[in-house]
Amino acid sequence: MFVMDAINWLMARPVLCLLIFMFIRSMIQSRQPFPEAGGRTKGAHSTAEFDGLVKEGLTLVDFYATWCPPCKAAAPIYARMSEEEAFAKCTFAKVNVDEVRAVASSENVSAMPTFGFFEDGKRSTQVVGFSEAKIRQMLNSKLKLNTVNDNPPKELQKVD
């Protein structure tokens, strides 16, 4: 009888049921592990590892925090980008700002996520916040990729 009374009480309050459901869902999601790496991304867990990753060539670093919802949303997209053939000449790295505070401090990271572009050990550009379009644009620019084909194959060129 008590169970039926409780069910009837909850059914009469759909907004409360929705709020309870959302609360329980957020609690479950917050306990899921943060995807530190994926694709071709490499984690830097110390200053030495960070320095080794950015030392040569082009490196894109994702400065993230495990408690940051935009960082969690960006992680799978960042991992997929790292697997794209067009970006194979770029190293994709991740730095947990709470774990490697010295790197976050030395790179003046104050908002998460922040994506830093490093060329031969020196930061050249950064994107604060996650914008896949901006990051792709910067990667295309740094790798000198043509997003528009100025020289189409001869079959497609106009013949007079």
Model-found features: residue ranges?
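Short active-site neighborhood of thiol/selenol oxidoreductases, capturing the structured segment around
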Residues: 54-66
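Thiol-based oxidoreductase modules, predominantly thioredoxin-like and allied folds used
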Residues: 63, 74-102
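N-terminal signal-anchor transmembrane helix
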Residues: 31-54
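N-terminal targeting signals for export/organelle localization
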Residues: 1-38
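Short acidic active-site motifs
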Residues: 49, 99-103, 134
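Intrinsic disorder/low-complexity signal
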Residues: 1-7, 39-40, 145-160
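Hydrophobic heptad-repeat coiled-coil signature
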Residues: 68-71
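Non-catalytic, surface beta->alpha helical segment in thiol-disulfide oxidoreductase systems
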Residues: 110-153
